[in-house]
Amino acid sequence: NVHYAINYLQNPDVYHLGERAIVIGAGNAAMDVARTAIRHGTRHLECFSLSSHITASEYEASYAKLEGVNFIFNKKPLEITDKGVVFIDLNEAEDGTLTEIPGTEKLYPADSVIVSISQGPCTTITDSTKDLKTNTRGLFETDEVGRTSIPGIFASGDAVKGARTVVEAVAYSKTVAEAMHELSLIHISEP
């Protein structure tokens, strides 16, 4: 019973996660997943983070805590089984380097597991499209309404802003859609 965050968030009503679920990840998307799962009947939900902190915004994390999400830090998933997830403890050095602590493997029981970890941007489009500019993180460079470095080409969502909440991505995408609509009206009215 393993799912990916994006699939779960698209239609959480079709998933039955059971009483106990684990979310692997501690970013904004993981907070969305955790809160949604609790609202859909999961009683025990734990979010696991590799590091000693939550990468989600303070706002998102505080609401997740209020809704009953438990956070477990410095754990690396080793294996997902039909009984849950085996994690190993991690030591975090001052420079942020993480190292496994041998002998600390432990099974955390779960009916379901949702993977909500950051994924790097897909570079297929940028690698094959001349003059489409990206920043150092591989995200599209745009203006405030999503126009890219190529006239008539727009970009939105995580490809521009990086990992954010679904609400933020949708709000920005609406702004971009309005700009695209305005551009299409200009082209339609031109002879």
State where each predicted segment sits:
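Rossmann-like dinucleotide-binding cores of NAD(P)H-dependent redox enzymes
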Residues: 34-78, 189
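A conserved FAD-binding loop/helix module that cradles the flavin
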Residues: 159-181
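Residue-level detector of conserved catalytic or cofactor/ligand-binding positions
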Residues: 184-191
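Rossmann-like NAD(P)H-binding beta-loop-alpha module
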Residues: 16-42
